[in-house]
């Protein structure tokens, strides 16, 4: 992990923390004036924490999925995970109208995990001559789930409730209304503890079995970790694309595939990218905000396209 990456991360954190539409009386901060500190403690600090956890969590989800499927072009957005989580939340709203975030997250995890199993079953069933078809199948699968979610929402007259999950938005993250996102912390720790198993799993089922690692159990664990992270993210801030696709590929290109060494870099890169996108979202139409999900899709898409073009020239 280079010094420049760490410096860039803390610079972005400081920018995110001290930049916003609400004016802060900077001269009163050293006196610990409650009114001056309120915007930072109640809104900007929770937002920054949510950005860091979401960015790092989604980037690590991308790594896990890429090792399970053994394809560089998959992430939660190209495997149907985000759409499955959205469908799960809608079902929870209809079945349990008074459900809280924890209950909605539980439904989202179940739907996410089930969608992951179905996607992997499809990938294992079909023989692909081109690896680019793997994410295409995922996008088609996600489109089916998204259509089901929209039909279900329309049927139950809750179509407007979907708007918050279609595009990630951190503007509503405030103190005492985002703490569920801290569940990503133990997920990150577990991912690192099982990094060696995920690395071996990425080499293939035969090699994993020869090295004494249960491919099925490791893949199931990976899907559970991904499902929880995606569910927590969608419930708290909404769906965010490309973070889990761009960062793992860039890190693997420069540092290799040994996850024990690269996971901290992946987490830092994911957090930095999402904070950068959030700052752009606040600057473009200041004092108004663009949803971070829209900015992340634009920035991530451009970065990944540049990555592909560079690889094609090489």
Curated annotation (Swiss-Prot):
The keyword Transport applies. GO terms for cellular component: plasma membrane. Keywords: Cell inner membrane, Cell membrane, Ion transport, Iron, Iron transport, Membrane, Plasmid, Transmembrane, Transmembrane helix, Transport. Coiled coil: none annotated. GO terms for biological process: siderophore-dependent iron import into cell. CDD domains: TM_ABC_iron-siderophores_like. Belongs to the binding-protein-dependent transport system permease family. FecCD subfamily. This is Ferric-anguibactin transport system permease protein FatD. It comes from Vibrio anguillarum (strain ATCC 68554 / 775) (Listonella anguillarum). The lineage of its organism: Bacteria, Pseudomonadati, Pseudomonadota, Gammaproteobacteria, Vibrionales.
């Amino acid at each position: 992990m280079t010094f420049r990456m760490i410096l860039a991360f803390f610079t972005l954190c400081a920018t995110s923390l001290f930049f916003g539409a609400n004016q802060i009386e900077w001269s009163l901060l050293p006196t610990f004036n409650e009114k001056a500190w309120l915007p930072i403690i109640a809104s900007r600090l929770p937002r920054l924490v949510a950005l860091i956890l979401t960015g790092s969590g989604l980037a690590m989800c991308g790594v896990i999925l890429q090792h399970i499927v053994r394809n560089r072009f998959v992430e939660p957005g190209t495997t149907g995970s985000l759409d499955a989580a959205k469908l799960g939340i809608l079902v929870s709203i209809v079945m349990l109208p008074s459900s809280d975030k924890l209950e909605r997250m539980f439904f989202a995890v179940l739907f996410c995990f089930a969608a992951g199993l179905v996607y992997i079953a499809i990938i294992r069933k079909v023989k692909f001559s081109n690896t680019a078809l793997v994410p295409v199948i995922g996008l088609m699968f996600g489109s089916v789930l998204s259509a089901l979610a929209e039909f279900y929402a329309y049927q139950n007259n809750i179509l407007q409730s979907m708007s918050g999950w279609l595009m990630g938005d951190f503007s509503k993250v405030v103190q005492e209304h985002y703490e569920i996102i801290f569940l990503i912390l133990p997920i990150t720790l577990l991912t690192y503890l099982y990094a060696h198993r995920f690395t071996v799993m990425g080499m293939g089922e035969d090699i994993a079995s020869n090295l004494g690692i249960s491919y099925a159990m490791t893949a199931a664990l990976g899907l559970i970790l991904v499902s929880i992270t995606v569910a927590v993210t969608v419930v708290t801030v909404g769906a965010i694309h490309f973070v889990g696709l761009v960062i793992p590929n860039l890190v693997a290109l420069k540092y290799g595939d040994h996850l024990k060494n690269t996971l901290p870099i992946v987490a830092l890169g994911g957090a930095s990218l999402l904070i950068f996108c959030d700052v752009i979202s606040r600057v473009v139409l200041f004092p108004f905000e663009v949803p971070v999900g829209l900015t992340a899709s634009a920035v991530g898409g451009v970065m990944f396209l540049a990555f592909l073009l560079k690889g094609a020239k090489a």
